[in-house]
Amino acid sequence: MTPSIGYVDEDENGQKSKFLRSSDDPYRLSIEEVIEKFETHLENGLSDEQAKSKLAKVGLNNLGADEKISISKILAHQIFNAMVLVLIISLIIALAIKDWISGGVIGFVVFINIFVGFIQELKAEKTMGSLRSLSSPMARALRNGVDSNINAEEVVPGDIIHIKVGDTIPADLRLVDCMNLETDEALLTGESLPVAKDHEEIYDYGAPIPVGDRLNMAFSSSIVAKGRGTGIVVATGLDTEIGKIAKSLKNNDDAVVVKVDKSLNPSTKDYLIAVIKTTKNIIFNVLGTNVGTPLQRKLSWLAILLFWVAVLFAIVVMASQEMRVNRNVAIYAICVALSMIPSSLVVVLTITMAIGAQVMVTKNVIVRKLDSLEALGGINDICSDKTGTLTMGKMIARKVWIPNVGSYLVQNSNEPFNPTVGDISFNENSPKFIKETDDELDFIPHLPSPTPILFEKWLHIATLANIASLNQIQNEMDGSIEWEAHGDATEIAINVFTTRLGYTRDKLIGDSLEHLNEFPFDSSIKRMSTVYKDKDGNSTVYTKGAVERVLSCCKYWYNPELTALSEEDKLLIESNMNALSSEGLRVLAFAQREINISKENVSNREVVESNLIFLGLIGIYDPPRPESAKSVKLCHKAGINVHMLTGDHPGTAKAIAQEVGILPHNLYHYREEVVKVMVMIANEFDSLSDDEIDNLPVLPLVIARCAPQTKVRMIEALHRRGKFVAMTGDGVNDSPSLKKADVGIAMGLNGSDVAKDASDIVLTDDNFASILNAIEEGRRMSSNIQKFVLQLLAENVAQALYLMIGLAFIDKSGYSVFPLSPVEVLWIIVVTSCFPAMGLGQEKASHDILEQPPNATIFTWEVIIDMIAYGFWMAVCCLVCFVCIVYGKGDGSLGENCNEGSDTGCNLVFRGRSGAFAAFTWCALLLAWECIHLRLSFFKMRPELENPWWKQLAIDLWDNQFLFWSVMGAIVSVFPVVYIPVINNKVFLHAPIGYEWGLAVAFTILFLIGAEGWKWFKRVYYRKSNANNPEYDLERNDPFKEYSSFSKSNTMEIV
């Protein structure tokens, strides 16, 4: 019975297009079944009526409507976060009680927070437009028996499409005919080489077939690299493989609305639970507690916590006044509440990240989403694509084996097209012997001299059975000489190798050789041959191709004399091929023979490619970037695990992973079941349930033949283990995982626009090493964020304690007099502290920042305790300063109505506020300098240097000039604020002072002494605790420790 085809009536995404639904996969069907299923005809195609009818059912062949930038959504995102909402509530209350000055200052702070965030997010906002640009604009379709070019959007299932070299495939095709057809699917599957197609292949229903292995299919947005073909359209729009990826990008995994599955006959209770969960999600989304990076979520929770603490303190204020709430009490309550809110934190954080993003541009990293920069500091797992990221994305000859001569090895070749770069070494043994021997066999750097005759014969084949070109050109910009190549990637690699040894086609042909014939590479035959005649009249056949296809044409080989090729000899050659393949190399064989053109027909391929003499093998591969191994090692040293998720074959993936250090070089020392977990094929991983994956003692380091969903599941598995994950990729197939990861990192040079749109960060040089630059900058920012969060929150703690204790100061009318006015509180929090906090955000990274473990959180116990300690000591110093002024030299008179204006009798209170304000300001500024290092003394932040303390202090302070001038400027700003008329007594509610300056300075110095004493205590404590485990660093920096330590009993069987 022929499988049926149906159409879904509704589009779950609200698009006009309707989805094709089939009961069987086209790649499992014969061509005849596909023709019948899609109601088409190979010779005539669809009729216009059929095409019109199907277009009405399935819709246009595109990926949906444009998503435009939503100004309102960006603005709402800035307003609806907990920190800003708390400030807005304070603003409303201040205006409600007609405290215009405080309300104006709070309003300005709210505006700055919203404006800065809005501008930054507007710049980063991207659309899905580039995804649609991948579609082929035109397609060559057969309709009504006539070939015609139609708009690709009008292609429908059942259309007969013709494709040729250079075409972008307009839809998913089931191939019905192809000639040497190869398609580049790197952006879709991650496969580094073009995929040879075979329309006659049919797959059974027994096992799942990854997209990259469906050789009878050609996929939408792939590019035809070689040959031509014809196919039946089996999927369009969002039903194509690329469409499925686009659909997954559009679907919001963190949907706010919880839907009820009506097919399960839900009860009223189910609907009620869904409503409760939806309401909870909406509230948490508005407050920002379940969106954004870990730091943003923690800050949102912090804002909520501080809001309720502020409410509690406000209630305490009112209770202390026996609930007699008048304007004075309300102002004091607002003042206490504001002292708990780090008003400048959001804007400082945003500006610091914006500056960090500008710095990253100089390090080949473009930050699309500022949030991700802070998030990089906490990354402890990187899932990386292979092709073009860890590797160069170009092919290089790695090894050559000539029987009875030995093996040649190419090393240090980091310029694929440059034959002058790199070293060739030699070993007289075969690849099989080198692999199997227990001895360390070194390759000697000197090649045999003179060149062995068999190697010379092989070089002639490699040079003449090759149509790739290699040329030197002059760079127009700087005049330097560069190498460029044209042709098949495999042939270019061989050409570069032979040119390296002085063998080029022009030199060999010259005036001595005549090209008689050529049989091009055919995907069904998998070999190519050329025939040349020399000036003596002798003709020679030169052949190269897939090992099994060349061996089938060979009758002889040299062992060491020319001898017949037996079955044992072929098995030996195949074992050497397997040895090269196990290293991740693509292996080709080479053969030749002399041909008598007077007796044999050189136009007959079967005749020419017979009775050949086998001469050797070559192994080529896409080599790792020179810096990849070092970068992976640094990642391990930084406590970051690196996983390779690639569409390539297992052998290639495993070999590259070992070469760059993702897998241990001594993999043979590990038990078989451990290696099975370390290296898995996507089908193995995908066959496991989430529970089975979670029960694995460790997650795989390498997964080969990855489909997009495999990468997403790997990231989800890491998330379930509490990991913070970065994902790198360049292809369309990487987009869902880039979006799913905590930080998505796309390639800028060769990456698809789709991947860039789904990413948070783009590498402009496609270099894995640049990820380390991003992580280093992320860690620097996380460290600096920790510093200014400590500075700002310690000030909040100090002000809250100061004002709460200040409730004890009761004036003549029985109301509390606040020892700092609301504007003084806001001035210290917003103006005085804001710029030094930005300065802390620009601190340079410590020299060992990549040798430290990832920053799991900003709010460590050390930071929390520091916050309380510094805040308490600052409050004590400033409160004692106020008391000394009012009750020491003063008579203790607190006047009346001093919270609103400078009435009679308020002079002493105003002078006390001025002294305390100066002390508070200067203590806060010194705290900024103290926060440069959480433990080291302010006077010796670099103990490894031998400079005198005063000289080193001057160097350290001047090193961050923004922070230096911010602190100095804020120190000086106290004087005009205290002395300028009207501003002092009407706005700040304080008065000019004299001897009180001395007290302010004295208590500032006392705060500095206390802070230094606290740091000294911490250094002693951590020195003792860190001395307990001297081998900790060695254990922490062993990336494979957990793989080598889990026992056989808790290892899961992988089948």
Curated annotation (Swiss-Prot):
Gene3D superfamilies: Calcium-transporting ATPase, cytoplasmic domain N, Calcium-transporting ATPase, cytoplasmic transduction domain A, Calcium-transporting ATPase, transmembrane domain, HAD superfamily/HAD-like. Disruption phenotype: Reduces sodium efflux from cells. The rate of potassium efflux from the cell appears normal. The active site is phosphorylated in presence of sodium or potassium and in conditions of higher pH. Not phosphorylated in presence of calcium ions. It holds the Pfam family Cation_ATPase. The active site is at 385 (4-aspartylphosphate intermediate). Keywords: ATP-binding, Cell membrane, Ion transport, Magnesium, Membrane, Metal-binding, Nucleotide-binding, Potassium, Potassium transport, Sodium, Sodium transport, Translocase, Transmembrane, Transmembrane helix, Transport. GO terms for biological process: intracellular sodium ion homeostasis; potassium ion transport; sodium ion export across plasma membrane. The keyword Membrane applies. It is a multi-pass membrane protein. Belongs to the cation transport ATPase (P-type) (TC 3.A.3) family. Type IID subfamily. This is Sodium/potassium exporting P-type ATPase 1. The gene is ENA1.
